[in-house]
From Swiss-Prot:
This is NAC domain-containing protein 19. The keyword Ribonucleoprotein does not apply. Dimer. Interacts with RHA2A, RHA2B or RHG1A, but not with RHA3A or RHA3B. Transcription factors that bind specifically to the 5'-CATGTG-3' motif. Expressed in stems, flowers, cauline leaves and rosettes. The NAC domain includes a DNA-binding domain and a dimerization domain. Transmembrane segments: none annotated. It holds the Pfam family NAM. Residues 14-162 form the NAC domain.
Amino acid sequence: MGIQETDPLTQLSLPPGFRFYPTDEELMVQYLCRKAAGYDFSLQLIAEIDLYKFDPWVLPNKALFGEKEWYFFSPRDRKYPNGSRPNRVAGSGYWKATGTDKIISTEGQRVGIKKALVFYIGKAPKGTKTNWIMHEYRLIEPSRRNGSTKLDDWVLCRIYKKQSSAQKQVYDNGIANAREFSNNGTSSTTSSSSHFEDVLDSFHQEIDNRNFQFSNPNRISSLRPDLTEQKTGFHGLADTSNFDWASFAGNVEHNNSVPELGMSHVVPNLEYNCGYLKTEEEVESSHGFNNSGELAQKGYGVDSFGYSGQVGGFGFM
């Protein structure tokens, strides 16, 4: 008799209705900055893996939390021993940057960069494009160990599978039909609701029956329309002197102005100068999220870092 696998979600003991929808700023300041400074988290929602050792469709099973998108802390290796370009080879293919970088700021200070990448199967530059997307968050001036072969000790990655045009068309048609029927006024509330459910079931079934080029066992059946975000172009950032992320994270922890529900958080000012340097890759933030995290319950205590157990703008308790 084999050993029964433990569900990571069950181990977290999360309250009903828990959602994790952090903003770009929250991911950068409250998670990546603290991770780079060596702090632990009272609630582990982001797994630590070497993301570039796996194909993206394997990653959902390695995540600690998530249904439609998954978060990971991962190191980033150099492409060449003394170079500054990252190695993007992963699993059976490679990640390719696309579009424009987005600079993440807090309290008017630039703290990190968000990069969007698409996974291709095969060898560059003749790989086959898939619908798997990665948003990579990295610090502007990461802390690096002397002589390290890694470009970054930690970056934070959001992984998700983009909805195809065929899936989106089926979704839109189903919603339109359901709304049209609901607005006719010829049926009772009960029959309208029943028909709405039938329509939803039919187009979800149609989605499941379609054959896509890159199907995998972790395909998600719950689909939603693509979201868009404003893209910010920039020429680059200067290589400043090593910034003390440990001190910065310590200030964040020491600051007692941590918000309750719905209040904006306070982050100390970062006193350093940013210059400019030429970027080597073009990237696109094709799928942004601006809604904050949510918790369905209240009344939790304060953890060792001074963060309230109530739901706040940070998306964790």
